[in-house]
Amino acid sequence: MSSSNSSSAVRSSAKHAAERIQQHLPPNSNHAVSLSSSSLNLPARTSIVAPGIAHSSRLKDRPSASSSSSSSSVSASSPSTRRSGTPVRRSQSKDFDDDNDPGRVRVSVRVRPRNGEELISDADFADLVELQPEIKRLKLRKNNWNSESYKFDEVFTDTASQKRVYEGVAKPVVEGVLSGYNGTIMAYGQTGTGKTYTVGKIGKDDAAERGIMVRALEDILLNASSASISVEISYLQLYMETIQDLLAPEKNNISINEDAKTGEVSVPGATVVNIQDLDHFLQVLQVGETNRHAANTKMNTESSRSHAILTVYVRRAMNEKTEKAKPESLGDKAIPRVRKSKLLIVDLAGSERINKSGTDGHMIEEAKFINLSLTSLGKCINALAEGSSHIPTRDSKLTRLLRDSFGGSARTSLIITIGPSARYHAETTSTIMFGQRAMKIVNMVKLKEEFDYESLCRKLETQVDHLTAEVERQNKLRNSEKHELEKRLRECENSFAEAEKNAVTRSKFLEKENTRLELSMKELLKDLQLQKDQCDLMHDKAIQLEMKLKNTKQQQLENSAYEAKLADTSQVYEKKIAELVQRVEDEQARSTNAEHQLTEMKNILSKQQKSIHEQEKGNYQYQRELAETTHTYESKIAELQKKLEGENARSNAAEDQLRQMKRLISDRQVISQENEEANELKIKLEELSQMYESTVDELQTVKLDYDDLLQQKEKLGEEVRDMKERLLLEEKQRKQMESELSKLKKNLRESENVVEEKRYMKEDLSKGSAESGAQTGSQRSQGLKKSLSGQRATMARLCEEVGIQKILQLIKSEDLEVQIQAVKVVANLAAEEANQVKIVEEGGVEALLMLVQSSQNSTILRVASGAIANLAMNEKSQDLIMNKGGAQLLAKMVTKTDDPQTLRMVAGALANLCGNEKFLKLLKEEEGIKGLLTMAQSGNIDIIAQVARGMANFAKCETREIMQGRRKGRSLLLEEGVLEWLTSNSHIDSASTQRHIELALCHLAQNEENANDFKRTGSVTEIVRISVESSRDDIRSLAKKILKTNPYFSS
């Protein structure tokens, strides 16, 4: 059993690998791989494991796409591929030729996926129905050989989205309602098949979950954005043949009215709400859903106990533009027209059998009324389908409400919901036949368009009121204007008389003023002439002043240029004076130096003493003259130049004498220097000879180095040639590995084909054993054995042709695709016990652990973890995994990935390691137990199942050691808080997980050292409950034995 749990994900990974390989096959290839959810199914091993990993939690009346065993791809495999001696008979149902008739009732079918209970109970049986959505057909199995085929307008698998269902079923009806036609959308089917989910799901948290009601109103409100369309709704339920208002629960037992002339059905007492937007509708719909009757049954946790009818009234004005253009016209063309349409969305309560649904008490009465109304509806459908003259619509209030939907003037779309389980064969057949009969009904679709006299009346009344008010306003305005004009006329007459008097007076005054102004104007002309003459004179003076101003500016420019030149000249003179002063100071310094030198040579230069005194006197006189002539630049410069020349002549003479003396002294110094230089040359010559010798030595060293370099060059050339040969060899090896990889893929496809054939043989075996007896079962078991032997032969041939060592080498490839395919093959091989030893001997465990530690690819992590889980079933592999730190590495995987499939594989591997007594303490030290508890926090039912299995294995091994006397003290699990976790999860829905938790609690309770912890956590009550309610006899017996023998529990 543990082998099937640990290797199921490996089979899934191998399936995906084969699909990936098949994508690269040419389009016309004959090697197509047939895959299903049971590909690569290998023999199971016995251990404490979870019986299934691919469980799906069942939500309230909701189709789920997570269950692979209930997908249509499995059940849609062609029966012709299965080997059977009995031919398969298929009976075709009549195809409907009037698909384009807009009045025909459109019928669609939707299949609910298997729930968790059906996955366990129906695991060995094929699906009851087989869907063919491409050709819009459904096959219903009668038995293993016979099936009936039915055609529908739409066929939806269990993976179909809510949006796709709405667009296929309801959207054409909604569009017709917007165009003015009545419409009906209805869901019919057995209880628990997803009617309320399909029609009435609100989808508050997830918009993708919204049902037909919400999506239909969303489309209608989107088109009703203009003011010409109004949308109103009413929401009723038919509960036990009583019509109740879901929007006003106090309204009970509302009556139904029928118009004798038109035959229209109405419910006048229902609450009608004007819908503004989608949020408003969702609030109203939530109120109605809250008031609807529901109950918990065996087949559905929230089973609807009433028929819900949502009625949407759409009113649309047709000539809005004409009314705006001619608001006052009263002709026939001005009468507004309106289109009234009505949409019924009906969520029927599910038909059910009391013995299967487990109803009792008041729910039996509810079921009677539900079945009664549905029976009446079925009778009406039968009568309409058969063309009967009498339609029994008055047998039930439901048929009266739906009178216009079947055989009336509405466009009707029916969706029937069915389940995949064979336990409800009769209910599924009845539902399908109901849909087939409904497809024969053709309604007379009519467009309801009428004159809107009410709107016209209101508009005319508004116009009359407006015109009356306008006439009164005009009369008042006319009277007020008349009084105002009379008043203004009187004022004008008075003002005219006064103006006439003022005009006569003013004319006399103006004549006098005119005479005075003429005289003053003549005087002003004279003054103007005088000012003109003065202006000409001033103009001439201005011209003269301008000329003077130009001359003045020119003189100023010349003066400024002169001043600039003067300033430059003065600066030049000052620089020259400063230079002469500096030269005089330099001469004084030189003279003083000469004095010092002459005093030292008195015997030789005695004749120069007088000249030196005269020079000092001349210098004194020169300085005095220089001070006197500071204000006269030119004279002072000339005198200074003369004195300077004389002083230079004298100083030159003195310098000549000094040079002669120095020359004598320098001759002696030159001789001594030549001696010194000769000595230095000798020393340098010796150094040069030494340098020559060292140079010769270095030259020899360089020659030796050069020879070494030549040898190294030859060696490097040889290494380069060797590297080229190695590269060529590696290229050949790479090509060889690629060819081996292609062989590996080919063998993998053959293996999968064999496994697929084995699955078909297994299904046929299970069916044949139930119907054909022992003889047919034995024949098919022999075929199954042959298929299994063929599979083992294929795996053996795969190992022999390619070799496990080469496959493990491909795991280290840099090509990610090659690496993924290689690890999938290793995982597939690891599921076979014969290959596990070879993988361990070839270093497969080290390679997989290294891959898990270093890789970041989710696919590699998932498949490698599955391979490790398979290898962990082998004792030798367990030793190697623990010695290489595999437990700690697996425990840390919870921080590396959150993929539930990967974590399930890791939990399965740790659970297998928990079954070895040698590693209990080491698993705790390397945080293996803590890692399992951390993985259980994900909430995934499959991961929790593996964690529970691991705890049961650990507790079982501890109990065995304690009974054999090899261990004492509290359980290691209690130190990690496992007891609290087991207690809190002991009521989990999964039967296998609950069994493992019960086993773990019983094994822990056998150790008396754990008694205080059981009392502290309240787990004793769980032991008591297990002794009474456990589904396994052996577990109940063990719990009772513990309660009797343990004094701490009995007290």
From Swiss-Prot:
Binding residues for ATP: 189-196
Coiled-coil features, chain-numbered ranges: 452-534, 568-761
Main location: cytoplasm
GO biological process: microtubule-based movement
Localisation: Cytoplasm, Cytoskeleton; Cytoplasm, Cytoskeleton, Spindle; Cytoplasm, Cytoskeleton, Phragmoplast
Composition-biased stretches (Polar residues): 772-788
Keyword Coiled coil attributed: yes
Ranges where the Kinesin motor domain occurs: 104-441
Job of this protein: Acts as a plus-end microtubule-dependent motor protein. Involved in the control of root hair tip growth by promoting microtubule depolymerization and limiting the accumulation of endoplasmic microtubules. In vitro, binds to polymerized actin through ARM repeats, and to polymerized tubulin through N-terminal motor domain.
Subunit composition and interactions: Interacts (via C-terminus) with NEK5.
Listed name of the protein: Kinesin-like protein KIN-UC
